[in-house]
Structure formats: C-alpha cells, structure tokens
C-alpha cells in the first residue's frame, strides 16, 4: 500500500512539474496552434471544393478527351510498366502511354518493348538534358537551305508544322551542318515541342494537345533536292520520330503534288496502315480551300493562301508564331500548368485532391508552416507521458465538449496542456492522411494475382484442393479456337508473302523511275550540247555567207 502511495505521489509530482513547465511555454505555442488550425482549414476547404478538374493547377481548366476503354488500357499498361520498373516519374503521363499503345495497336507486350527501347534511347542520347546541353548555332543558315518550322495553330488549337521540300538545297545544307548535329537539333525541337509548345497550345485551346498538323509543299521536288546525305538524314529523323515520339501527327497535307507524285502515292498507300493513310491528304495546286477549312486565314502564311506575312519577324518561316510566344501563357507553362493530371479508373475524390495537394502545395500555400505534415504536427502537440486515468476519461469529456463548447477547458485539463486544439486537429489530419495514403497504395498495387483468382473461378469447376477441371465442351471449344487461330496465322503468313512480292515490285518500279530520271537528265544534257553545237554551226554558215557576198561584190 505504501509503495502504491509513493508511486502515485511521484506520478502526481511529475505531472505538476510538466504542467508548470508547459505553462511557461503556452504563450509560445499559441502561434503554432493557430498555424496548425489554418493549415487544417485550408486542407478541409480543398477537400470540399467543387468543380475541380483533373489538372495540376486550379486556375487552368483543360478538357481531357480520353474515353473509358482507352483509360482502362492505359491503366493496365501502367501497371505492367511498374512491375518491370520501366516507369520513371517524369514519364508517368497517361497521354504519353496512350500514344505508345496506339502506335502498337494496343498490344501490351509490343508497346512495353517499344517503351523500354525509348527509355534506353533517351538515356544513351541524352534527350532529357538536350535542351540545355546542345546549342545549334547554325540555325539561321540551315533555315535558308531547308525551310521548315512551326507557324500558328489550326482551328482546333494544334500547332502547324510546315516544310517547303521543293526549296531544299541538300548540298549547301550539308556544308553548314552535319547529319549528327541536325538530328540533335531535331530531337531538341521535339523536346521543346512537348515541354513548351504542346502545353502552351493546351492552355490556349483549353483542351489537351499532343499532336500537330503538318503541311508539306512538294512543288519542284526532284532528284536534285535530295542526294544520298539528305536521304540518310531523312531516314534517321523518321526512325527517331517513329520509335520515340509516336502518334504525334494528327493530319498531314501534301500540297502542289503533281501527277507523278499522286500516281506514286496511290501505289505506296496500299502498303500503309489505313489509319495512317487517313491522316495524309495529297492535294494539287488548288489546296487553299481545303487548308482554310482546317486553319484560320490569319494563322496561315500568305504563300499558302492565308493572310499572315510576319513581316516584322523576317517572314513566316522564321517567326515561330504560336501561343508559346505569349508571355502570360509561357509563364503558366514554366509554372507547370497546361498538363493533365494522371487519371484513374476509380475516380476517388480523395486521391485526386491528395495528388493535387502534394504537387501544388508550394504554389497555393507559400507559408513555411504549411509544409508541416500531419505527423509532424502530431509530434508537436502530443506528449507521450499522459496519465492513464486521464486518457481513459478523455472520450467521455470529449462527448460533453461536442455538445457544450464551453466544456473544452475541462477536456483539455484531463490531459497534458500541450494536447488541446493541436491534438484534435493533428489527430484528424493524421487519420485522414493515413486513410488517403492507404487508398493510394492499395489502388496502385498490381492486380494480376487478384484478377487471376477471379477469372479462374468463372465457367470452370474448382475442387477443394484447388485443381481445376475442364469440361468436354470447354475442351472442344478451346481446340476449335486454337485451330481458328492457326488458320489465321497461316493466312497472315500468306498475306505477308504477297506483300513482300508487292514491295519488291514497288522497289523495282522505284529503281526504274530513278534510272529513267537519270536517262532523262543525260538526254537533256545531250540535247543542250546539241543545241549549242547547232548554234555554232549556224553562226559559222552565216559568217561564210557574208564572206561570199563580199567576194561577189568585188
């Protein structure tokens, strides 16, 4: 009994000492309590705010047009990438993953292989830092001999890329730069397009933009425009674009195409995918009406039938006109706006706000006190040396305090003086953050095993020992399906052989065209020499006639 009394007195003295020390610090903690309350109120306000879109910033509203089926495919693709550790945070973008899926016709394994190759290429090529590391000083000279660049946007907000292939001088181009340097410049421009131009267009159009409209002017295109070096350059650029920046073309207009080009295109497009050919429109010299249906006249250069001249910037091909030149839009792009937040299938409000709060906390709440987590607040306001009797009495007094706010003083007196409003808000914050964190973790966990267990129980008999038995009907159906697949494979192999023959025929036709163009060039040269010789002979005959007349006069 005496020991119990001594222990009780020691504990009582300990509490008295703590209370006296805490009273001295109570005034200092008032400001911390107020800051914690303000931070909690702001968090609660963000939880109840309505009308927030899936955007990283509240002030820019961007429409995301991905449908449910595509979102399901992206979600499955994302889980596969996470399992194989192929998803850096920089590339955790559902639009980027969707482009790779579309490029491989939603074949998960092929898209994953393409994604892996892209990551390896970016690491080896240094694409992530090429905007800062590479300086293309010869750009002014290059544009003279290879007129190309972005100019304006179409009516749907996509940037317009223009190339005047008929004015390409490959010989002079290779004198001012090299193939490697131009390819690096091309990659740098593509990175700039994804990091600056597409987000700027998305902000201006208020819808997600990650594709462009291309115009190729082929007037005057011939063998003289493209030597071997130029062909190698175009092949290198095309390979990089197809392998690492897929599905960035929305539509392409090939203008000023002659009869020969159209005939060749009709032959070539039979070997291309129908979706690809649907994007390409081959037009003659009456293309203005078609372009103006897609592009506003003020956004289209004058030499293509529009009204824009960009006289103050040295011409349309040098102006780089577009919303990315707007200072306000460019500032928003630099702040990380113009990008859609990764969407999920569940649509849980807490998860979206949690991600939004983590990503924009520094912009929306610049005060240093708002950077404290719920766990840190709880550590500041909770003392571990709480008397057991006081802790047991806490729920009862808290219920009374909820009914009568004036009893809050009694509630706080049951525990350490540090545990007042800070404890309440800290506990709520910790609980809320814990729930949201668990929801995020469980949602992003791989679901292959779960799905396998679910689907294995549908349409089959499972005994208690876990052995699955296949019925006779299921076996027959499976054999029939395998037979059908084998027939389809054989049919595809036959079609592949047929396409190989057509490709060989096309290659032979292209070689024949090259030979004919070479013969035509030689014939023109011989004809010019013959004409020159004929003029010399005529001049000689005329000279002889004059001498003969003089002789007859004498």
Curated annotation (Swiss-Prot):
One of its GO terms (biological process) is phosphatidylcholine biosynthetic process. It comes from the Eukaryota. InterPro entries: CRAL-TRIO_dom, CRAL-TRIO_dom_sf, CRAL/TRIO_N_dom, CRAL/TRIO_N_dom_sf, PI/PC_transfer. Residues 472-534 form a coiled coil. GO terms for cellular component: Golgi membrane; plasma membrane. Residues 138-312 form the CRAL-TRIO domain. Gene3D superfamilies: CRAL-TRIO lipid binding domain, N-terminal domain of phosphatidylinositol transfer protein sec14p. The keyword Manganese does not apply. Pfam families: CRAL_TRIO, CRAL_TRIO_N. It is a peripheral membrane protein. Keywords: Cell membrane, Coiled coil, Golgi apparatus, Membrane, Protein transport, Transport. It is found in: Golgi apparatus membrane; Cell membrane. Its main location: Golgi. Required for transport of secretory proteins from the Golgi complex. Catalyzes the transfer of phosphatidylinositol and phosphatidylcholine between membranes in vitro. Belongs to the SFH family. This is Phosphatidylinositol/phosphatidylcholine transfer protein SFH2. It comes from Arabidopsis thaliana (Mouse-ear cress). The gene is SFH2.
């Amino acid at each position: 009994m005496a020991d119990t009394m001594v222990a009780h007195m020691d504990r009582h003295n300990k509490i008295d000492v703590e209370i006296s020390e805490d009273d001295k610090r109570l005034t200092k903690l008032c400001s911390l309590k107020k800051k914690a309350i303000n931070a909690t109120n702001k968090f609660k306000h963000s939880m109840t705010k309505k009308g927030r879109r899936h955007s990283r910033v509240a002030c820019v509203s961007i429409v995301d047009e991905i449908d449910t089926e595509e979102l399901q495919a992206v979600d499955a693709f994302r889980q596969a990438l996470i399992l194989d550790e192929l998803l850096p945070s920089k590339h955790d973008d559902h639009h980027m993953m969707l482009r790779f899926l579309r490029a491989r016709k939603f074949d998960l394994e092929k898209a994953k292989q393409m994604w892996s190759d892209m990551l390896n290429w970016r690491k080896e090529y240094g694409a992530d830092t090429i905007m800062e590391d590479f300086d293309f000083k010869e750009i002014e000279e290059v544009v003279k001999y290879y007129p190309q660049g972005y100019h304006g946007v179409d009516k749907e907000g996509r940037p317009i890329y223009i190339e005047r292939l008929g004015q390409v001088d490959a010989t002079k181009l290779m004198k001012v730069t090299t193939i490697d340097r131009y390819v690096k410049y091309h990659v740098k421009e593509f990175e700039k397009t994804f990091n600056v131009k597409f987000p700027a267009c998305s902000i201006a159009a208020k819808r997600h933009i990650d594709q462009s409209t291309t115009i190729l002017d082929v007037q005057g295109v011939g063998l003289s425009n493209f030597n071997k070096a130029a062909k190698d350059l175009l092949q290198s650029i095309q390979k990089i674009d197809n392998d690492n920046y897929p599905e960035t073309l929305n539509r392409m207009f090939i203008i000023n195409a002659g009869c020969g080009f159209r005939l060749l295109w009709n032959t070539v497009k039979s070997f291309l995918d129908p979706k690809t050919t649907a994007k390409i429109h081959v037009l003659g010299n009456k293309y203005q009406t078609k372009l103006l249906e897609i592009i506003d006249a003020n956004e289209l250069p004058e030499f293509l039938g529009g009204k824009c001249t960009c006289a103050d910037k040295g011409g349309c091909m040098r102006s780089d006109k577009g919303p990315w030149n707007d200072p306000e839009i460019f500032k928003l792009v630099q702040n990380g706006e113009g990008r859609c937040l990764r969407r999920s299938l569940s649509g849980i409000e807490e998860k979206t706000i949690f991600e939004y709060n983590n990503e924009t906390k520094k912009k929306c709440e610049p005060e240093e006190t708002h950077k404290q987590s719920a766990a840190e607040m709880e550590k500041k306001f909770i003392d571990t040396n709480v008397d057991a009797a006081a802790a047991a009495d806490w729920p009862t007094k808290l219920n009374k305090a909820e009914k009568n706010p004036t009893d809050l003083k009694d509630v706080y007196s049951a525990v350490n003086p540090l545990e007042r409003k800070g404890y309440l808000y800290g506990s709520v914050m910790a609980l809320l953050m814990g729930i949201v964190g668990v929801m995020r973790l469980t949602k992003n966990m791989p679901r292959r095993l779960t799905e396998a267990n679910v689907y294995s129980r549908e349409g089959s008999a499972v005994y208690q020992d876990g052995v699955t038995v296949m019925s006779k009907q299921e076996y027959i159906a499976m054999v029939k399906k395998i037979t059908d697949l084998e027939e389809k494979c054989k049919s595809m192999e036959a079609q592949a052989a047929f396409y190989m023959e057509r490709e060989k025929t096309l290659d032979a036709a292209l070689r024949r065209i090259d030979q004919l163009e070479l013969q035509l060039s030689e014939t023109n040269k011989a004809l010019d020499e013959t004409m020159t010789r004929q003029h010399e002979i005529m001049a000689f005959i005329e000279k002889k006639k004059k001498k003969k007349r003089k002789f007859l006069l004498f």
